[in-house]
């Protein structure tokens, strides 16, 4: 289908199938604004009409020849399905798990709550991850035709679950924010995602992603990388663990971090070092009070 170069670039960045984007009736081709309008429709929960012929439905096995309800892979759900399948097919993805001691974060957050609002536990993790990206530039990267492009600024995407799918708004210049500023922006983006008021700039330019399933009692999981990023961090639930420290038995508040990375971009040792930097920052959250230098 005819499409402008800007439209193709934006569609590729957001993982949008141009065959699903209506042609601009005046331009008689797909424009960047056509893609932007299509994305807004997906965010609002509307499934735009498909311009490609639908394939014939597959016959159900005999054992399932009874009334069923089919959820069509169209609109946002269809975009997610294609994007995640392409991600797993095109990257060498693997995941490591590391526990983080959260006692210092719990104490810091409690002190903040006494004087007003406090960041969420996920906000602390995002802030720590953004600073760790500055220490480990290989993780803040993209695979290009020429090699691994190291990106100068960390823009961290935060996965937000909606009724019909998952959307990843982006906190711009994440490491350049102090914890309070980051918390305000993450709250704004999460609310905008849920009420369908996100704008296109809120979804562009992410260099790394954080996904949280801790609210469902999950410890570790294997998040799928959001292209064109080369890594994504999963955040598990807060839990009380019995641990042995210097010969003394005690209870510590901990959570599990799950880092999935593209082995084409970097190996296991750099991945582990990056995750360890996050753990160290969570162990002393005072470093998150000011923007990273």
What kind of feature is each model-predicted range?
Residues 6, 10-17, 29, 34, ...:
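C-terminal catalytic/motor cores of large multi-domain enzyme assemblies
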């Amino acid at each position: 289908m005819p499409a402008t170069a800007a439209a193709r670039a934006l569609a590729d960045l957001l993982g949008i199938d141009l065959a699903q984007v209506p042609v601009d009736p005046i331009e008689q081709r797909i424009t960047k604004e056509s893609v932007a309008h299509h994305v807004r429709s997906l965010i609002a929960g509307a499934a735009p009409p498909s311009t490609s012929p639908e394939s014939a439905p597959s016959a159900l096995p005999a054992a399932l020849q009874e009334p069923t309800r089919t959820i069509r892979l169209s609109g946002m759900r269809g975009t997610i399905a294609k994007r995640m399948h392409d991600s797993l097919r095109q990257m060498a993805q693997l995941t490591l798990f590391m526990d983080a001691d959260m006692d210092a974060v719990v104490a810091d957050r409690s002190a903040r709550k006494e004087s007003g609002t406090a960041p969420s536990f996920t906000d602390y993790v995002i802030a720590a991850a953004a600073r760790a990206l500055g220490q480990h530039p290989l993780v803040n990267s993209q695979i290009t035709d020429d090699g691994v492009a190291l990106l100068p600024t960390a823009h961290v995407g935060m996965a937000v679950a909606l009724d019909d799918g998952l959307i990843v708004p982006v906190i711009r210049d994440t490491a350049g924010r102090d914890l309070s500023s980051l918390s305000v922006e993450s709250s704004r983006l999460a609310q905008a995602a849920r009420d369908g008021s996100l704008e296109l700039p809120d979804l562009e330019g992410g260099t790394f992603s954080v996904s949280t399933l801790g609210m469902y009692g999950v410890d570790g999981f294997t998040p799928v990388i959001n292209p064109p990023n080369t890594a994504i961090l999963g955040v598990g639930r807060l839990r009380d663990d019995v641990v042995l420290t210097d010969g003394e038995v005690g209870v510590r508040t901990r959570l599990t971090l799950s880092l999935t990375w593209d082995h084409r971009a970097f190996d296991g040792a750099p991945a582990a070092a990056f995750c360890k930097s996050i753990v160290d920052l969570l162990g002393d959250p005072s470093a998150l009070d000011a923007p990273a230098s």
